[in-house]
Amino acid sequence: MAKQVTGQAKFQVPGGQATPAPPVGTSLGKYGVNLGQFVQQFNDRTKEYNGTPIPVIVTVYNDRSFDFITKSPPAASMLMQSAGIAKGSGVPNKDKVATVTRAQCEEIAQKKMEDLNARDIDQATRMIEGTARSMGIIVDG
């Protein structure tokens, strides 16, 4: 007999630094999931992304067991790391906060390719460049 899905939760947690506090506790507590077990498994799986926000999708079953899928870090956080800034521009059309090269955008697109809705690497690179522009980051090259 297959397990019946009780619910699904989506949230972002810093890689390798999950705790039972929000957003993990508030999202999974209502399903009765063992938070300590989730935190330990998540931290083990994402320790190489220490501190980088990682999107996670948790599927909870009727016996309170769970499976989770981790996605690649958001493009915005990868761009901020590449550009060496803490946050994007509040007024991206007027204030430019940093510069990245097209090669850096292509590298980010390579890492995010499986999560992006793009047919090839060129389309994915253009999507990353659009994200950079909307953050007030200039794309050179």
UniProtKB/Swiss-Prot annotation:
Record HAMAP family: Ribosomal_uL11 (MF_00736)
UniProt xrefs under SMART domains: RL11 (SM00649)
Annotated region (Disordered), positions in chain: 1-23
Q: Name one GO cellular component term.
A: cytosolic large ribosomal subunit
This protein is called: Large ribosomal subunit protein uL11
- Tell me one GO biological process term: translation
The function of this protein is: Forms part of the ribosomal stalk which helps the ribosome interact with GTP-bound translation factors.
| PANTHER family attached to this UniProt entry | 60S RIBOSOMAL PROTEIN L12 (PTHR11661), LARGE RIBOSOMAL SUBUNIT PROTEIN UL11M (PTHR11661:SF1)
Q: Which GO terms describe its molecular function?
A: large ribosomal subunit rRNA binding; structural constituent of ribosome
Q: How is it modified after translation?
A: One or more lysine residues are methylated.
Please give the subunit comment from the record: Part of the ribosomal stalk of the 50S ribosomal subunit. Interacts with L10 and the large rRNA to form the base of the stalk. L10 forms an elongated spine to which L12 dimers bind in a sequential fashion forming a multimeric L10(L12)X complex.
Q: Which domain of life is it from?
A: Bacteria
What the record says about family reads: Belongs to the universal ribosomal protein uL11 family.
Q: What Pfam family is a match, any one?
A: Ribosomal_L11_N
Annotated source species: Rhodopirellula baltica (strain DSM 10527 / NCIMB 13988 / SH1)
Task: Cite the entry's keywords alphabetically.
Answer: Methylation, Ribonucleoprotein, Ribosomal protein, RNA-binding, rRNA-binding
